[in-house]
Amino acid sequence: MSQKVLPTKINLIQFRRQLRLITVIKRLLENKREVLLLYLRTYASEYEKIYNEVNEEMKKVYESYLQAVASEGISNIEEIALSQKPSLEVSSSIKVIFGVKVPTIKLDKSTIPPKPFSDVETSPYLSESYEEMTEALNKIIELVELESTIRSLVSELRKTQRLINSIDNYILPFYRGSIKFIKQILEDRQREEFSRLKIIRRILQRRRESGSG
């Protein structure tokens, strides 16, 4: 590719200027990569924490549910569940983290349905399961938001790394090779010009010497 570059002093100056600019861009991208990695480590740690909390919450929900089934019977539990219409609503918006758009998700607590059963007429385990599930919902929503955030950050990190790789593997070698090529041609021309001048000086010197003789 360097051989297609016109070897002129102007091009040499321009290529050197562009190389400096590309080097600055690469440094900025590397800084961005480091910040993204820092955010990712922070969010991954938070995700692991919430994930473990959700697991513990859901274990409690499941244990209470199994005890409620044993007490009430699966058919009664299913009848209560089927009597309810889906009502949960979540709202989502976008926030920006270091130039990366990530979702925010919130549960509308007013849409959580009230208990569709009486505490007096049903097993206390059923009420316990309902309350534990209600508490777990917010953490589940938070977990979903964290997962989406991590995916967005990973996607941006991959794009940034691809740009850095492109600069390292293609752009920088092209500019460095082009500068080397232009310098070599200009130096060769300078040497040729210097040699021609020496020859001309010798010829002129001989003429002067022969004329004076």
From Swiss-Prot:
Membrane topology value = Peripheral membrane protein
* A GO biological process held by the record: proton motive force-driven plasma membrane ATP synthesis
- Output the Pfam families linked to this UniProt entry: ATP-synt_D
Q: What InterPro entries has UniProt attached to this entry? A: V_ATPase_D (IPR002699)
GO cellular component, alphabetical, reads: plasma membrane
Q: What is its main location?
A: membrane
What protein is this chain from?
A-type ATP synthase subunit D
Q: Which organism is it from?
A: Saccharolobus islandicus (strain L.S.2.15 / Lassen #1) (Sulfolobus islandicus)
The gene for this chain is atpD
